[in-house]
Amino acid sequence: MTKKVYHQYWFWYLAAFVVFLLDQGSKHWIEAAFDYNETKVFTSFFNFTLRYNPGAAFSFLADAGGWQRWFFTIVAVAASVLLIVWICRVASSKPREAFALSFILGGAVGNLYDRIIHGHVVDFIVVHYQDYYWPAFNLADAAISLGAMVLIADLFINPDKTSGEKPTNA
């Protein structure tokens, strides 16, 4: 592995670490500044409300009895290892993909940390329209979503040139 490639994938790992730090810093701040379920309204469609989510996205399995903490921990660890390897493989050749993966990795590790340390994920960002409220989320969730959107957009912007080719027999 060349020195240039080595530095490129470490750049993306550093980006993931920055996402993790921003996520954890925001969660630390919200827990210090707010009581549970306390709301601060910023606009007619955006507010902060401190909430705890023992489940996954959209509180999936939040009331499952406790086993979900370790199940989602194992899933997050496996996904993080996969993302670390994937970033290493694409760091020098696909920077947009590496960017997306680093945001997903940083967000995944941020929520993983919460789940291991607190037994739940700290959520606080609430977006709504009139009486319809999107489930509360955090910066880690936003980073994961942004990374996923960039990956999907990249599929359309740069389709794999080999996807339409038939494999050749050697």
Curated annotation (Swiss-Prot):
Listed InterPro entries: Peptidase_A8
Compartments where found: Cell inner membrane
Pathway(s) where this gene product acts: Protein modification; lipoprotein biosynthesis (signal peptide cleavage)
Catalytic reactions of this protein: Release of signal peptides from bacterial membrane prolipoproteins. Hydrolyzes -Xaa-Yaa-Zaa-|-(S,diacylglyceryl)Cys-, in which Xaa is hydrophobic (preferably Leu), and Yaa (Ala or Ser) and Zaa (Gly or Ala) have small, neutral side chains
GO biological process, one term: proteolysis
Record flagged with keyword Cell inner membrane: yes
Membrane topology label: Multi-pass membrane protein
Main location as per UniProt: membrane
Segments passing through the bilayer: 5-25, 70-90, 98-118, 137-157
Keywords: Aspartyl protease, Cell inner membrane, Cell membrane, Hydrolase, Membrane, Protease, Transmembrane, Transmembrane helix
GO MF annotation list: aspartic-type endopeptidase activity
Record function comment: This protein specifically catalyzes the removal of signal peptides from prolipoproteins.
Name by which UniProt lists this protein: Lipoprotein signal peptidase
Source organism of the structure: Cellvibrio japonicus (strain Ueda107) (Pseudomonas fluorescens subsp. cellulosa)
Organism classification: Bacteria, Pseudomonadati, Pseudomonadota, Gammaproteobacteria, Cellvibrionales
